[in-house]
A protein has these predicted regions:
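Mature catalytic core of soluble alpha/beta enzymes
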Residues: 1-288
Length: 288
């Protein structure tokens, strides 16, 4: 078994390849490393010269033309925002800044400041023009970020490259919370994957997205605040067991796991509208 680790997009990527010569495996890993770093230069909120930072700085002044790939991601975000009734919203960035989740200077803001910040949150403030891939922000202070979907998008691009290279079996993991199992190791029915509750599942040609706040939170005056904010209220979502979503598309699994953590009542809508996904909020028996 070959395995490779590298950092990109603020997380650790891991690639497992069960077959092939070491030189070939290293070449495959190099292709994926290059791709994730290319995406980081496009999507990062923390690189001042990224495409996203340029968009955030200028799109409220005039329409900005973006690459078709980025425009496709924005269209996906728009669709998921509608599907989840606003629980998934990449314009949440002003709220993330307000609570200190961007600069790591954590604080609990007052209700009036939260209400004011909410005026700059909402995908309806991001106007998309497909003819030319133009993007315009309706208000100054609107900011996009892809923390709830970017890892899934990156994993999806990695899987695309693996298939182009003819790789029959691989596991691509982004941060332990978003992964895709391509094929299966020789002699196995799938890739054995451990869930946060300690149980294991077998995945084959499937993606997994997991969301929870057990690892990222802060406390103020004895009150615990998780890092997953509800873009509809401006406050952290109530702490609850992790949510796992299994499906064909790692992008969907990444985004929907976050949305369902924020609003569990959306589960029936997701099951109806996205027949290729399986959802568990209890984390037991998923995919067995």
């Amino acid at each position: 078994m070959h395995h490779f680790r590298w950092r990109a997009m603020g997380t650790e990527f891991t690639l497992y390849l069960p077959e092939g010569e070491a030189h070939w495996a290293a070449g495959v890993a190099g292709e994926l490393q290059e791709e994730t770093r290319r995406l980081e230069r496009q999507l990062s909120l923390y690189l001042p010269d990224s495409d996203l930072c340029y968009l955030n700085a200028h799109a409220h002044l005039h329409p900005v033309r973006v690459e078709p790939e980025l425009f496709q991601l924005l269209q996906t975000c728009q669709s998921l925002h509608a599907l989840t009734q606003g629980a998934f919203d990449p314009t949440i960035t002003p709220l993330l800044r307000l609570w200190g989740f961007v600069d790591k200077q954590y604080r609990a803001p007052d209700p009036d400041t939260i209400a004011e910040t909410l005026e700059r949150v909402g995908m309806e403030l991001v106007l998309l023009e497909p003819n030319g891939c133009w993007v315009y922000y309706a208000l100054r202070g609107v900011e996009l970020s892809f923390g709830a979907i970017g890892k899934g998008w990156a994993v999806a691009q990695c899987v695309r490259i693996l298939r182009q290279l003819g790789v029959p079996s691989a596991l691509v993991d982004a941060g332990g919370s978003t992964l895709y199992a391509l094929g299966a190791p020789m002699g196995a029915d799938g890739w054995r994957t451990r869930l946060p509750d300690g149980s294991e599942i077998l995945l084959r040609d499937a993606a997994l997205g997991v969301s929870g706040d057990a690892e990222q939170f802060f406390e103020v005056n004895g009150v615990r605040y998780g890092h997953i904010l509800d873009p509809r209220t401006g406050y952290p979502a109530p702490s609850r067991p992790p949510v796992a979503v299994i499906g064909d598309d790692p992008t969907l699994c990444d985004a929907l796991s976050t949305a369902l953590y924020i609003e569990p009542a959306l589960e029936s809508i997701v099951r109806t509208r996205c027949r290729s996904v399986s959802v568990s909020t209890a984390m037991d028996g998923l995919g067995k």
